[in-house]
Amino acid sequence: MPFELPALPYPYDALEPHIDKETMNIHHTKHHNTYVTNLNAALEGHPDLQNKSLEELLSNLEALPESIRTAVRNNGGGHANHSLFWTILSPNGGGEPTGELADAINKKFGSFTAFKDEFSKAAAGRFGSGWAWLVVNNGELEITSTPNQDSPIMEGKTPILGLDVWEHAYYLKYQNRRPEYIAAFWNVVNWDEVAKRYSEAKAK
């Protein structure tokens, strides 16, 4: 079964004014769609790999034939990263997490504000294209960043919150003002989804 572009759980203009409609449309229908198309093309001659999940492919890249390893890394990573990204955004987002996730953030980082500052620094400090992440690693929360479309899954970590800092994610609205885009991101974070992913990651 080929991989498919997931539908967005909200309209393209739902995240306005924080993330604009045109960016969301191009980002989803063009950029993400291209990763899916190229991933399927890379796997086309390898029926033994076509039934594997994205997580199975990305968590063991070394097991893949060398001829398709880079294509799966880049396009499979792009598909995984964006599939998560769309779900952790919401027009009803923002605010702060509650419950178990809030407790874990306070315990690890001292406060929600301190966590936001550290995550924002990871996003702003990622040179060139890449992502900032909140991951679960051995049951613990951790902030990390990855280059290009690399996924924390490749390092055995479980991403629960991600921010795309490729220029295609923000340039139409924010041009080179990445810190403004990062600040706007906090207004649309779907903390219920992040909390769900945290619970699932801890149960692994």
UniProtKB/Swiss-Prot annotation:
Enzyme nomenclature, EC number: 1.15.1.1
Any one GO molecular function term: superoxide dismutase activity
Pfam family, one: Sod_Fe_N
Catalytic activity, reaction form: 2 superoxide + 2 H(+) = H2O2 + O2
SUPFAM superfamilies, per the entry: Fe,Mn superoxide dismutase (SOD), C-terminal domain, Fe,Mn superoxide dismutase (SOD), N-terminal domain
Keyword set, alphabetical order: Manganese, Metal-binding, Oxidoreductase, Phosphoprotein
Keyword DNA damage listed: no
Residues that, per the record, bind Mn(2+): H27, H82, D164, H168
GO cellular component entries: cytoplasm
Alphabetized InterPro entries for the sequence: Mn/Fe_SOD, Mn/Fe_SOD_BS, Mn/Fe_SOD_C, Mn/Fe_SOD_N, Mn/Fe_SOD_N_sf, SOD_C_sf
Cofactor(s) annotated in UniProt: Mn(2+)
Cited function: Destroys superoxide anion radicals which are normally produced within the cells and which are toxic to biological systems.
Family label: Belongs to the iron/manganese superoxide dismutase family.
Protein name: Superoxide dismutase [Mn]
Gene that encodes the chain: sodA
